[in-house]
Amino acid sequence: NPETRYAGTPHNVGYEVVERLALSWGLSWDMTPEALIARGSAEGKNVCLVKIQTAMNLTGSGLKHLSESMAFSPEQCILVFDDLDLPISAVKTRIKGGAGGHRGVASVLEAFQTDAIRRVKVGVGKAGGKLDRVTYVLTAFDEESRIAIDQSILTAKAHLLDMMGRPSVAKTH
């Protein structure tokens, strides 16, 4: 979600991973009507990082439109997103499959009519106590969780590099 009120919440972990990649690679963001885009060369490859500027649940239509104007296929994409079903700090990759209940991923799979889209899932844990799922993903991380998420983001970056075909410096799971 592009709005600043989502910064630092479980809902925007994917954005954080992509932002940190852009920063570590020295890429800057350009704004288009659909997305913020950072292009350049990194790790010996041409890369294009995308932050769709729509609500998470509408990511698919924005990414599909962008794929048509920029001529890329879903097989060239790697989605990065939060996963409530993974414990906080866990990171997993998939090369294809269903949405697993994630509305943003469902939107992308529906827009492209394929499940063959690679993904990096960053665990944000489950809502605890009296919080419902929606409130939880829209509430900023507490200090302990923030530390775990920061480590997860580093792990997610390593997994992204692996998926791009570059051996990772640290093989983590």
Which role fits each region the language model picked out?
Residues A99:
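Conserved TIR/SEFIR loop-to-helix hotspot centered on a Trp-containing motif
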